[in-house]
């Protein structure tokens, strides 16, 4: 049997990290077992589902490198098939037409409230002669659900869960306008797509009993179900915007790497030893559902920042430099010349060691593209005393005698410090302030080599007032 799983988002908004983790678990499960990962867009909410929202979800999955093995299936294109299955159930006596009016249903709800019981349709049209149907009423089609016994689900994460059939009512399969309900459409689509494992959030667990009854009524084999716990905020409440970023593309825009976000989400609810950082190939090799816990996970943004910093330091300099250039132009409004882009690339080993996100990385590279005189932090300004400016003027003369390589510049600073009987830091920090406007940067000899003699001279002269 070939394992086939699916991720089935509704395009009514952004892809949130809970959905992203569900997609990741499906993807890794399929890859681990040599199976196939599919995508179904559940766009049956015709008012809220938009092409723009669909594109946002597809872009987010593409950014996370969770690409489906087949073209996406759009649920809205399958209404005829959903109706066909409902008609088959009618013909087999597994479903029936219900002509209840809105007023009758409202009275049932009111009675349930008075009795302090959950609302359930009372089945009044279950065995009634359709000849008694009122004129001008378009019926819904309801499942003829079993009333005796239990429906049992053997969940691969939650274990065995069961419900008494008397607690379930005859759910609607087709609305009066002929459109399918969500629960019916999902079952038909999963069956037709050959889905073997349904891996989704445990907020869908109660739906599974009703969906299992549809499978049974059609004589179809049920897929395996695995309901994974939800992600909560640090306070244990349902994750929301007040906790921080929740949209996948918001994390992208804030400068998180996709592989870092996936790594963090994987470890949020799945465990395998003490390893915190796992490349994708190791994730595929190790992942299986037996490592998924039942308890809700808590989002830890500080931990995610740490994980992102680890991946940032390991990322290729060329890739990071290209992203920084794009962010400087898009987010900070600085046109970046080819020369400046080259300087950023040269400095990337030192820049990325201090950054936790791509946004921070771009901030730290601003000094490269700014023109002299540079804006100064208070700490940097305080370093540029009269004595420090004298040192800068003298250092320029020594630098002019070098080939402006990093090693030669370092030796020139070291020799000057020894000659003046000063610590190297007392020389390097004012120089850093003059060249970057800050007290934090990559090694200052690397900064000078990247900027080049003309730019270094221009920046020091601007501090000296020349």
From Swiss-Prot:
Give yes or no: UniProt keyword Nucleotide-binding.
yes
Binding, ATP: 241
What are the EC numbers? 6.1.1.17
* Annotated catalysed reactions: tRNA(Glu) + L-glutamate + ATP = L-glutamyl-tRNA(Glu) + AMP + diphosphate
- The domain of life for this entry's organism is Bacteria
Q: Which GO terms describe its molecular function?
A: ATP binding; glutamate-tRNA ligase activity; tRNA binding; zinc ion binding
Where is the motif named 'HIGH' region mapped on this chain? 9-19
Q: What is said about its interaction partners and assembly?
A: Monomer.
PANTHER family associated with the record: GLUTAMATE--TRNA LIGASE, GLUTAMATE--TRNA LIGASE, MITOCHONDRIAL-RELATED
The protein, known as: Glutamate--tRNA ligase 1
Native source species: Acidiphilium cryptum (strain JF-5)
Give the taxonomic lineage as stored in the record: Bacteria, Pseudomonadati, Pseudomonadota, Alphaproteobacteria, Acetobacterales
């Amino acid at each position: 049997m070939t394992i086939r799983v699916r991720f089935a988002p509704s395009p009514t908004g952004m892809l949130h990290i809970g959905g992203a983790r569900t997609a990741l678990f499906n993807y890794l499960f399929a890859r681990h077992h040599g199976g196939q990962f599919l995508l179904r867009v559940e766009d049956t909410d015709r008012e809220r589902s938009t092409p723009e929202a669909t594109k946002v979800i597809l872009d987010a999955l593409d950014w996370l490198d969770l690409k489906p093995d087949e073209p996406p299936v759009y649920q809205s294109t399958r209404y005829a098939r959903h109706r066909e299955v409902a008609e088959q159930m009618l013909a087999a006596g597994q479903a029936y037409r219900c002509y209840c009016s809105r007023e009758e249903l409202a009275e049932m709800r009111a009675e349930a409230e008075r009795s302090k019981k959950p609302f359930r349709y009372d089945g009044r049209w279950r065995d009634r002669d359709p000849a008694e149907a009122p004129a001008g009423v378009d019926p819904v089609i309801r499942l003829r659900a079993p009333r005796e016994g239990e429906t049992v689900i053997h969940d691969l994460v939650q274990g065995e869960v069961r419900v008494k059939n008397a607690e379930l009512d005859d759910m609607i399969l087709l609305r009066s306008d002929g459109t399918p309900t969500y629960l019916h459409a999902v079952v038909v689509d999963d069956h037709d797509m050959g889905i073997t494992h349904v891996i989704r959030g445990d907020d869908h667990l109660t739906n599974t009993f009703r969906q299992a009854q549809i499978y049974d009524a059609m004589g179809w084999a049920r897929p395996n179900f695995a309901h994974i716990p939800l992600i909560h905020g640090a306070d244990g409440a349902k994750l929301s915007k007040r906790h921080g970023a929740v949209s996948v593309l918001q994390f992208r825009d804030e400068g998180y790497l996709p592989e870092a976000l996936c790594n963090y989400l994987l470890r949020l609810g799945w465990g395998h030893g003490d390893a915190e950082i796992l490349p994708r190939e190791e994730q595929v090799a190790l992942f299986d559902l037996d490592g998924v816990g039942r308890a809700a996970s808590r989002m830890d943004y500080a931990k995610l920042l740490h994980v992102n910093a680890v991946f940032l330091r390991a990322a290729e300099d060329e890739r990071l430099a290209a992203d920084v250039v794009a962010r400087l132009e898009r987010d900070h409004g600085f046109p970046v010349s080819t020369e400046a882009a080259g300087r950023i690339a040269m400095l990337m080993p030192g820049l990325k060691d201090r950054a936790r996100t791509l946004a921070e990385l771009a901030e730290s590279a601003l000094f490269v593209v700014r023109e002299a005189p540079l804006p100064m932090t208070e700490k940097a300004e305080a370093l540029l005393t009269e004595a420090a400016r004298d040192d800068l003027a003298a250092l320029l003369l020594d630098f002019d005698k070098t080939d402006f390589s990093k090693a030669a510049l370092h030796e020139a600073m070291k020799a000057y410090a020894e000659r003046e009987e000063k610590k190297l830091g007392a020389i390097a920090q004012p120089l850093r302030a003059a060249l970057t406007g800050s007290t934090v940067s990559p090694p200052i000899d690397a900064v000078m080599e990247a900027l080049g003699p003309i730019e270094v001279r221009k920046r020091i002269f601007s501090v000296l007032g020349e």
